[in-house]
Amino acid sequence: MNARTPNSLTMGGDKSFADASPVPIANVRSLIEATFQRLRADIVEGRLAAGSRLAIEDLKSRYEVSGGTVREALSLLVANNLVQTQAQRGFHVTPMSLDDMRDLAATRIALECEALRQSVLNGDAEWEARVVSSYHRLSLLDERTMRDPVHLFNQWEQANRDFHEALISACSSAWTQRFLSILYLQMERYRRLTAMHNRPARNVHEEHLALRDSALARDAERCTELLRMHIESSISVVRQFGLLR
């Protein structure tokens, strides 16, 4: 009987061990990240409705990935509080409510107003330049987005985030800025909800202009009060139009 050599394993009907080599970890991680980003966008932009069930099989077909990849992406979204999971009930998109929006807004006000106060009092010339440049980019989008929120919201959202981050960038607390980044992302679904109704209810462009001017004037008291009103205005729009309970 002839002994089979290692090379003979690759011939005939036998499959090479090399053919069954595992997928590189980097590729697996990038696929999970891509699925996470697509899922997140579908949730935040409302294609997967708040409170709706997220069936693994449906998501596998939707994103053309394995069940394991879907579960990993969903776990990341659970950590981001955009998805909830319960025993025997599977995964669901985290519901939206007026109480949740109020809670997020109140927490954001408490942290962001203090971070803004520190920045206004301590910011240097580089901070001023960042505030001015980020405001300029945002102002170019403010009025256009109010006229066409559906198509321009993603651009406006990034510019709006850049402006708010610029305002508090001279705050010395890295933890405060980190928590505010989380809160800002959590409120994105609510900002999208109110964007469709802002035009008759408020002038967001004027609110941003007033924030910029008071920040550059180093008027910490006025600037923080304007920020509080700016954040609370979104709640007023939701209540005015009965968008949430």
Curated annotation (Swiss-Prot):
SMART domains named among the record's database cross-references: FCD (SM00895), HTH_GNTR (SM00345)
DNA-binding region: 56-75
Top-level taxon in the UniProt lineage: Bacteria
Alphabetized SUPFAM superfamilies for the sequence: GntR ligand-binding domain-like, Winged helix' DNA-binding domain
Pfam families in UniProt: FCD, GntR
Coiled-coil region list: none
Matching InterPro entries: GntR_C, TF_FadR/GntR_C, Tscrpt_reg_HTH_GntR, WH-like_DNA-bd_sf, WH_DNA-bd_sf
Protein's name according to its UniProt entry: Uncharacterized HTH-type transcriptional regulator BphR
Species: Paraburkholderia xenovorans (strain LB400)
Entry keywords, A to Z: DNA-binding, Transcription, Transcription regulation
MF (Gene Ontology): DNA binding; DNA-binding transcription factor activity
Domain HTH gntR-type span(s) in chain numbering: 29-96
